Curated annotation (Swiss-Prot):
Cross-referenced InterPro entries: KsgA/Erm, rRNA_Ade_diMease-like_C, rRNA_Ade_Mease_Trfase_CS, rRNA_Ade_methylase_Trfase_N, rRNA_adenine_dimethylase, SAM-dependent_MTases_sf
UniProt superkingdom: Bacteria
Protein task: Specifically dimethylates two adjacent adenosines (A1518 and A1519) in the loop of a conserved hairpin near the 3'-end of 16S rRNA in the 30S particle. May play a critical role in biogenesis of 30S subunits.
Keyword Manganese: no
Enzyme Commission identifier(s): 2.1.1.182
Binding residues for S-adenosyl-L-methionine: 17, 19, 44, 65, 90, 112
Name the UniProt record assigns to this protein: Ribosomal RNA small subunit methyltransferase A
Gene3D superfamilies to which the protein is assigned, alphabetical: Ribosomal RNA adenine dimethylase-like, domain 2 (1.10.8.100), Vaccinia Virus protein VP39 (3.40.50.150)
Subcellular location: Cytoplasm
Main localization (coarse): cytoplasm
Catalysis: reaction(s): adenosine(1518)/adenosine(1519) in 16S rRNA + 4 S-adenosyl-L-methionine = N(6)-dimethyladenosine(1518)/N(6)-dimethyladenosine(1519) in 16S rRNA + 4 S-adenosyl-L-homocysteine + 4 H(+)
Keyword rRNA processing carried by entry: yes
Length: 265
């Protein structure tokens, strides 16, 4: 059954596909399991399909929306329900730590992320994982598959390693194109990300770790000896216990961490 609050048309420039199917809206709310006084931040509330049910549960909610035309109708729809604070900005420019300080608690992020910038958004929030309790995002299923991919998989790559290093990644369920208006050309999926305890991650230098992962998968058909020639010496590989003739997709996340932490002696 279709559920619409207002008829502001979707804009291709913003990668908008509005969720309208009540069955999937209810499933998403159930997966998020919002509680009173949760500090929820929604990225791209759109027409409020998820926003308003969350607001009913929590009483207040912060939304980050770039499309100015959606702000007034969404505010009007939310006013009888609870306190909705809309930040009219590109999420990539928002410092989430400020929002966490305002509420004095970790954030719960949710959102139907625009497919055209989903990866930049994921890397942006990953940098602020320490102030995030959990994340529930809807993305293109292909992206969700990459996020949760195990080593050895064809879609295991930089996104897989970076996200899994800092978060537990779980694929929840698939959402078909006809649940949206306009319908996208591909399936979508809901993913849950729960940041790991920082004391268990043990990455000594996050920039070096990121550089190694980027370089390794930037030339994934090459052996690590060749793809990481400018970053890692044979001593690094020896200390980490990693074969130089291995390829990026063969390494576990923990092995990338070991390689980044290895000493050059």
């Amino acid at each position: 059954m279709e559920s619409r609050l207002f008829n502001t048309p979707a804009k291709k420039a913003f990668g908008q596909h509005f969720l309208v199917d009540r069955y999937y809206i209810d499933r998403i709310i159930h997966a998020i399991n919002p509680q009173p006084n949760d500090h929820i931040v929604e990225i791209g509330p759109g027409q409020g399909a998820i926003t308003l049910p969350l607001l009913k549960c929590c009483g207040s909610l912060t939304a980050i929306e770039l499309d100015r035309d959606l702000i007034a109708p969404l505010t009007a729809a939310a006013t009888p329900i609870g306190k909705l604070d809309i930040i009219h900005r590109d999420v990539l420019t928002v410092d989430l730590s400020i929002l966490a300080k305002q509420g004095n608690k970790k954030l719960r992020l949710v959102g139907n992320l625009p497919y055209n910038i989903s990866s930049p958004i994921l890397f942006h929030v990953l940098q602020q994982a320490a102030i995030i309790a959990d994340m529930h995002f809807m993305l293109q299923k292909e992206v969700v598959d990459r996020m949760a991919a195990p080593p050895g998989s064809k879609v295991y790559g930089r996104l897989s390693v970076m996200l899994q290093a800092w978060c537990e990644v779980t694929t929840m369920f698939v959402v078909p194109p006809d649940a949206f208006q306009p319908p996208p050309k591909v399936n979508s999926a809901i993913t849950r990300l729960v940041p790991r305890d920082p004391t268990t991650i043990r990455i000594a230098d996050t920039k070096r770790f990121s550089d190694i992962v980027r370089a390794a998968f930037g030339q994934r058909r090459k052996t690590l000896r060749n793809s990481l020639a400018d970053i890692c010496t044979p001593a690094h590989f020896e200390h980490a216990g990693i074969r130089t003739n291995a390829r990026a997709e063969q390494l576990e996340v923990t092995e990338f961490i070991a390689l980044a932490n290895a000493k050059n002696t």
